[in-house]
Amino acid sequence: MGKIIGIDLGTTNSCVAIMEGGQPKVIENAEGARTTPSIIGYTEDGEILCGAPAKRQAVTNPKNTLYAVKRLIGRRFEEKEVQKDISLMPFKIVKADNGDAWVEARDKKIAPPQVSAEVLRKMKKTAEDYLGEEVTEAVITVPAYFNDSQRQATKDAGRIAGLEVKRIINEPTAAALAFGMDKTSKSDRKIAVYDLGGGTFDISIIEIANVDGETQFEVLATNGDTFLGGEDFDQRLIDYIIDEFKKESGVNLKADVLALQRLKEAAEKAKIELSSSQQTEVNLPYITADASGPKHLALKITRAKFESLVDELIERTMAPCVTALKDAGCKISDIDDIILVGGQSRMPKVQEKVKEIFGKEPRKDVNPDEAVAVGAAIQGGVLQGEVKDVLLLDVTPLSLGIETLGGIMTKLIQKNTTIPTKASQTFSTADDNQAAVTIHVLQGEREVASGNKSLGQFNLEGIPPAPRGTPQIEVIFDIDANGIMHVTAKDKATGKENKITIKANSGLSEAEIQAMVKDAELHAEEDKKAHELADARNQADGMVHMVKKSLTEYGDKLDASEKAAIEAAIKDVEDVLRDGDKETITAKTEALSAAAQKLGEKMYAQQQAEGAAAGATGQQAEAGEKTVEGDVVDAEFTEVNKDKK
């Protein structure tokens, strides 16, 4: 049985971990880093780059380099958060045929799960390279406040990447697992996980209890904002730099996508530096040019200035914290530990705010970038039976219900209900002789149906004619351990029922997912061929270099015809090196190897002759030494014997 890997699929960075010898281990990627930028670049020649290589070419290829796509996953194009991002991103966010928010690169529409699948594939490959075996199963984390559509879309991304997603777990819960696994406290403790990542914010109140020798992680409440994170902090800094540059030079950089990409990189770097320094300088020579010539950007930014720019964003994390505490039935004094997760939580001002909310210092012994992947790996170990005596009780973050008469949402499952769970309620018809009912499934906290997220709708038909209010329609909601919902509607009189696994009235269809899986497999085949071609080129190049070197040293030992044949074979290889296919390059390399055989024989013969000559000289010298040494030994031996007599 293969390993179940744990993947933190982040907005800005992603991370992969496994269980090894009973302990979680974060795996370094091919570039030697423990986290991978969640960035995908589509190059002109059709190559798909992921991680650091994609980030490096972003400045010269801004329209085809996709980042922060997790903010769009499972979202509709019309949503105000999506509309806000359209003006900020250098790449195109477009409306799909089903109304979802998709992206565009190289004139091709791409679904966010397809982009996320490229990141997941990189994580999968990282684990496979380390383990030396194929990986097909994973636990993937999502923000606790992700709705059903976003969870389903994440699961789809896993499938496209060739992974069976064994479990979707919430990021704060995963971080709690990572924190609590090595704590052997006998008493129960309540912890707050404050997770401010690249694109999302979550707060979860979790109780870690020891129940009959089993460590139980129970999520008491969760809250958050799925459109608040480090990317927004970067944007505040970018906007400030643009405004300052405009004041100074009169040039607006907002329309210049190349300049914006350089600014994004510089802003992210400056933000990180300001967590450890009081001041930093953004220096971007040749940022743009006008009629008067090139323009350079040089701007000093203090920590205080940056804090004032993002103060409102930090403030926005307060209300969810207060709500989560209230929903959990906890007072601030009940919280034993506060854990910080997500790169943005490293900002000193954020840590100050957390201390202000909870009245105590947050812990610093949890790595904010790796804790979530570590927790996912532990959950993988639990599912595999490798980690024992751990029970995870997660919750559904938002209430679930259906639309009833008057456009009202009737809740069947309240928010923060432990999952998996099941609930049912009986409804009836609104009109006389109504033959069908439409079950409109909603997720959210508003009383008015239109104020909540529509997860989908389906019909139950064939209801026998009867006065309104007479038929008994039972609606059953069933949420699995991934937080994904299955809904059944049943006419109690006839036994007729209809059921669906909720897919947003958008979302990817099964056919689309299958097409994307095939496309991914095709790319994998292309990648393999590209790898084999690169290997063939390297081998050919090495052979040419070696033969040329040998020809310089030993070419005078060859006949003119032999030398000409080798030189011709070298030229043949050099001619196909750039544009030839793998088979042609391999054939020409083998032909060169055969032609160079004669040269090899001459080299070997000369080396043998030189070796023999050197050996003969050495033997003579050694014999002389031995004679002298032998005389001495004999004389000494004789002396001793004489004395003994």
UniProtKB/Swiss-Prot annotation:
Which Gene Ontology MF annotations are present? ATP binding; ATP-dependent protein folding chaperone; unfolded protein binding
Induction per UniProt is: By stress conditions e.g. heat shock.
- Where, per the database record, does this protein carry Phosphothreonine? 200
Question: Is ATP-binding given among the entry's keywords?
Answer: yes
Region listing for Disordered, in residue ranges: 604-645
Classification via InterPro entries: ATPase_NBD (IPR043129), Chaperone_DnaK (IPR012725), Heat_shock_70_CS (IPR018181), HSP70_C_sf (IPR029048), HSP70_peptide-bd_sf (IPR029047), Hsp_70_fam (IPR013126)
Keyword annotations from UniProtKB, A to Z: ATP-binding, Chaperone, Nucleotide-binding, Phosphoprotein, Stress response
Low complexity bias spans: 605-622
Pfam short name (any one): HSP70
SUPFAM superfamilies the UniProt entry points to? Actin-like ATPase domain, Heat shock protein 70kD (HSP70), C-terminal subdomain, Heat shock protein 70kD (HSP70), peptide-binding domain
Q: Which family does it belong to?
A: Belongs to the heat shock protein 70 family.
Which HAMAP family did the record assign?
Answer: DnaK (MF_00332)
Question: What function is annotated for this protein?
Answer: Acts as a chaperone.
Q: What is the protein name given in its UniProt record?
A: Chaperone protein DnaK
Q: Which organism is it from?
A: Dechloromonas aromatica (strain RCB)
The upper taxonomy is: Bacteria, Pseudomonadati, Pseudomonadota, Betaproteobacteria, Rhodocyclales
